[in-house]
């Protein structure tokens, strides 16, 4: 019989650089010395949002005045399972201080610089390092595809997905190499829709799977970054279960129509709560209205 799930509320606080506030677990706690996002167990009868605000104040002295639900997922430790209800704090008051004697640190989510990180927080930290804009490039002509990818970078895309489903594998790999070289000065991460082997041969940062491939996949492929297309809620749940890093949620016909017109579809990170980070067509994605405070306090 599986163990019951412990409900946990977590708060993500970022400064004006986008750095994230982490706390080191004390010697009195399980997993002492591990670094984590502020948070803790949800009390009986308490809402997840109220628990996140309470835990943040109790641990760091920060009072959240505006926040929104962001991610919600289950993590299995060897002896227990926890469901993390993660909130992004948009506005807050106070000077961060370790009120329980713990050390605090502002870290770059992509390169935290502190270790070890509590395993249950790894997915959230990875998601915090994803960009806000993603571009899907769908051109079989290498020159036009490269031009579309460069245009996407000029518009701020930090992730590029290359789709060329009508190409043979070797053609797809050559196309991806051309695009990767073209956008290298801008530094986006590039994913190729295809197999893990194709992505590796192309020198891509990872692979991307359509919804049909997702449903056929028994497990996450061996790539650094894996994105998937999701048609509905069941696809999103499956993607989270398979260990996808993010999902594109867009009607396939709309995506295909956009690509036929220009070979480029821009998508924005959606601000609503989900099992994993979602990107939607830029015109329909929830606007991220987060504003970071100009003064973030001095740590002790």
PLM features per residue range, with description:
Residues 131-138, 160-162, 190-192, 206-209, ...:
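Hydrophobic faces of well-ordered beta-strands that scaffold small-molecule active sites
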Residues 144-159, 195, 202, 212, ...:
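Alpha/beta enzyme core
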